Amino acid sequence: MLTKRVIVCLDVRNRKVTKGVKFKGNIDIGDPVEMGARYSDDGVDELVFYDITASAENRPCDMEMIRQIAKRVFIPFAVGGGIRNLDDMHEALLAGAEKVSVNSLAVLHPEIIAEGAKAFGRQCIVLGMDAKFVGVSDKIPSGYEVFIRGGRTAMGIDALEWAKRAEELGVGEICLNSIDTDGVKNGYELTITDMIAKAVQVPVIASGGAGTPDHIVDLFRKTSADAALVASMVHFGDYTVPGIKGEMLAAGIPVRKKMNGEV
């Protein structure tokens, strides 16, 4: 088994890290810069910064916040929310991000994936996908439908087919978030995660539902996902990144260690 990554997600609203359940009832938790620095020091493999109100407010991602976080973290750092065009991608990368995540924009304008991959390299382009189980039908053969605008708008697009098309267009990675399990802390949505991970060649990040290290172990034992994205379980102090990685190692799942050899 290849080394598996643990990624912490910082959903940011009004310059505060926030978290809700199934995209609703968000509460503010803390300062993104300080939290990002702490997770970086703790040995998390990557950070994801989502400016969750930027698209709805029709403004670019908070570039100044990206610059501040980039100065404090020494790990790969992806940003999303308010990425509206190639110029926004370029500015985010110049601000210190290694990757940019496109979600609603990519669904509405798929050509942005190919354009971004050509301009910056596919390793810089992450497809963020919000999916929800709606039942198997002729239109949605996998049973999982793509939603945009923070999970508010159903698109009538099958999640598995969209993942395969996005790979063809040039994404370097797919972050699959399950709306059904987001913030619930009862475990990841394994079915669609494994479907997509086995159907594409690019890395797949599972998002939505992690509540205990056992859920992460379960993810890697039962699917071909490359990384686990966590938020609530570390933001609220239930678990730490070193603790999560320690339990993964104990379960026989290889993890990346810090330069001093600690997990």
Functional labels for PLM-detected ranges:
Residues 12-14, 18-19, 97-176, 180-181:
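Conserved anion-binding
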Residues 53, 61-124:
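Glycine/small-residue-rich loop that forms an oxyanion/phosphate-binding "nest" at active or ligand-binding sites
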Residues 73, 77-99, 191-228:
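Catalytic cores of alpha/beta
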Residues 113-119, 217-259:
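C-terminal helical cap(s) of enzyme catalytic domains, especially alpha/beta-barrels
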Residues 11, 39, 47, 79, ...:
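Conserved, mostly hydrophobic/aromatic
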Residues 5-9, 46, 74-78, 99-101, ...:
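Structural preference for beta-strand elements that scaffold enzyme active sites
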Residues 46-65, 104, 175-186:
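Glycine-rich, proline-tolerant flexible connector loops at the mouths of alpha/beta enzymes
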Residues 60-67, 110, 156-160, 186-195:
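Charged helix-capping and loop-helix junction motifs
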